Regions:
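Extracytosolic ligand-binding ectodomains
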Residues: 1-109
Length: 109
């Protein structure tokens, strides 16, 4: 997922960044972005698994996530019994003016 610079991001990302900075005293970095997406997927799976949680229900819920759209830029993620990677797409970026700039998206591998 490309890095989302706060000053050029959506209002939802700006809200995330504000909450993150209020808690940590720092602006979010790429690890924070990946961590947010990972945690959000876990929460979605826990909610889908229901209150009578079992390992089997949790795994089935994780593997049932389809077309999850992360808060941050990047491809949608889908999982299944034989698909645990989420996406088979990547992107190509270069540094321009001291910032990462995406020059190609959804490159399949």
């Amino acid at each position: 997922m490309p890095f989302a610079y706060i000053d050029t991001s959506s209002e939802a990302i700006k809200a995330f960044a504000g909450k993150y900075k209020a808690k940590t005293g720092q602006d979010p970095n790429s690890a924070a972005q990946y961590g947010y997406v990972g945690a959000d997927i876990i929460v979605a799976a826990l909610e889908a698994a229901g209150r009578d949680l079992t390992r089997a229900k949790f795994l089935a819920a994780l593997e049932g996530i389809k077309d999850y759209k992360p808060l941050f830029p990047g491809p949608s993620l889908s999982y299944g019994p034989d698909k645990h990677q989420g996406s088979t797409a990547t992107f190509l970026a270069k540094v321009e003016g001291g910032r990462w700039k995406v020059i190609a998206e959804n490159l399949l591998y």
